[in-house]
Amino acid sequence: MKKLITLSAFAAALVCLFSCETYKVKDPEMTAINKVDGKYMAFAYKDGAAEPTTMFAIVITNTTNDDADAGWITITDIDYTGLHWQRLFAVRFKMTVDANAQTFVASNSSVIEPKTAWNPYIEGAYGSYGSFTTASAQWGNFGCTTASINGKVVTEGVTTPSGHKADSIEFTYTLNYDDGTSESYTVKGQKKTGWGEDAIEYEEWLAEKGW
């Protein structure tokens, strides 16, 4: 009987040993440019205007090879005047990134049009993630050639209305068209936090515009 009790205790100890074993949880995988990548909302001031001309939804992503010195930026103009709220104008181009300084730059980088554009104000609606077919992809009138950009992301650079810290983004940006014209903007904004109140300034501005 004593032998059976001893064997039972040994078996219980083995069960505890294996069932109580802890496993190290891997840290989330980060991109090589994780200090600058992500989704941002920003006001755009055209040609040095004192008041915002429009609002941009910005997405910065890493390259296919996850290069530490390069990335892609997609800039979507939320102004759908003359277009459609599901058909926004967007451009995408490659830029050089300094991951440590959290800066990015491009000079006359070739522009492509993404097939879809991120609109933060319809994100999650209509079974979507805020992405809809871009205007030119729908109607075939893109007309852009190159873009130049010079900017920086500051970690926790702004305090949001919810009281949280968010990364800030600021850059100058010029878009060139195939007819020889161009548009230049100064852009200032913040990373999307997921808190509704943090976007209230942008929402109110859009509502005032009737967009």
Language model features with spans:
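Bacterial signal peptide processing site
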Residues: E21-K24
